[in-house]
């Protein structure tokens, strides 16, 4: 167990106080009084910050309540035909129930389908240690400082990327190891296209590597597929699509990926 989780460790070993739930309930009940006291007594900059925070909380709560109320609204459908024309009088009494909840649930379902995980070609990859990923760069007059690190793997940086000042740059991404394009294979069509990389979506090694844009085997990247002429069911052109890297770019010198369709 990590060193900073000693409280959780103690709870697991010895349990909680017998009156823990009661104390927690009372603490939560006192919270409103404490907030009220702070709102009345705090002045100056602290008072302004507190008021700003409370205002944001109230706005968020009102939005949440309004959204919850709208999701349960039921009412008659508008007297309009599907093509936007007014219904004749003899059809006005045939009101079809319009349930906002059903609409919102269908939208949620679509979002879930969109966010659904792909069955990736490489479900498991080898772990990479920090010693393998980073090389220590010694700096200073006598080369005694060792706080800088250089990434030894291929990386992707965006179009408008600029390096930080050398004195403050802790992690170096060498220009020679930066990739802008990838050889992407379409699994159904069986064609390979040289497409530009848009972003690094997920590196399976660590969230930090995702943030740094490190390209290793199994990494999910977003590529520009506008050249393939792919369209959605609604007829819109697809620009970005996810692909998984299937090779080791630092060994091959290029990025090979399979499109996730």
UniProtKB/Swiss-Prot annotation:
Keyword Lipid metabolism: no
Transmembrane segments: none
Keyword Thylakoid: no
Region (Disordered): 1-39, 62-82
Pfam families assigned: Ribosomal_S8e (PF01201)
Bias type Basic and acidic residues, positions: 7-39
Location of the motif Nuclear localization signal 1: 15-22
UniProt motif (Nuclear localization signal 2) ranges: 51-58
Subcellular location: Nucleus, Nucleolus
InterPro entries hit by this protein: NSA2_fam (IPR039411), Ribosomal_Se8/biogenesis_NSA2 (IPR022309)
GO biological process terms on file: rRNA processing
Gene Ontology terms: cellular component: nucleolus; ribonucleoprotein complex
Keywords: Nucleus, Ribonucleoprotein, Ribosome biogenesis, rRNA processing
Major localization listed first in the record, in broad terms: nucleus
Oligomeric and partner information: Component of the pre-66S ribosomal particle. Interacts with NOP7 and RRP1. Interacts with RSA4 (via WD repeats).
Record family assignment: Belongs to the eukaryotic ribosomal protein eS8 family. Ribosome biogenesis protein NSA2 subfamily.
Function, in words: Involved in the biogenesis of the 60S ribosomal subunit. May play a part in the quality control of pre-60S particles.
Name used for this protein in its record: Ribosome biogenesis protein NSA2
Organismal lineage: Eukaryota, Fungi, Dikarya, Ascomycota, Saccharomycotina
Recorded name of the encoding gene: NSA2
């Amino acid at each position: 167990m990590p060193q900073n989780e000693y409280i959780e460790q103690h709870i697991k070993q010895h349990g909680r106080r017998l009156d823990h739930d009661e104390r927690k309930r009372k603490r939560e009940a006192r919270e409103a009084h404490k907030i009220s006291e702070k709102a009345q007594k705090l002045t100056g900059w602290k008072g302004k910050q507190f008021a700003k925070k409370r205002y944001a909380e109230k706005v968020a709560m009102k939005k949440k309540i309004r959204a919850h109320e709208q999701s349960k609204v039921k009412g008659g459908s508008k007297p309009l035909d599907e093509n936007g024309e007014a219904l004749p009088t003899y059809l006005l009494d045939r009101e079809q129930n319009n349930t906002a909840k059903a609409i919102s649930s269908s939208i949620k379902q679509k979002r879930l389908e969109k966010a659904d995980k792909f069955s990736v070609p490489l479900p498991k990859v080898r772990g990479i240690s920090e010693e393998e990923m980073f090389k220590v760069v010694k700096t200073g007059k006598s080369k005694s400082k060792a706080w800088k690190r250089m990434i030894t793997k291929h990386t992707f940086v965006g179009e408008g990327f600029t390096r930080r000042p050398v004195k403050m740059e802790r992690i170096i991404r060498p220009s020679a190891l930066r990739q802008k394009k990838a050889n992407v294979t379409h699994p159904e069509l069986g064609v390979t296209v040289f497409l530009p990389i848009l972003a690094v979506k997920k590196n399976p090694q660590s969230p930090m590597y995702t943030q740094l844009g490190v390209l290793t085997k199994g990494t999910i990247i977003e590529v520009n597929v506008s050249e393939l002429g792919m369209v959605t069911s609604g007829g819109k052109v697809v620009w970005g699509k996810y692909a998984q890297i299937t090779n080791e770019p630092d060994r091959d010198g290029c990025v090979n990926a399979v499109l996730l369709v």
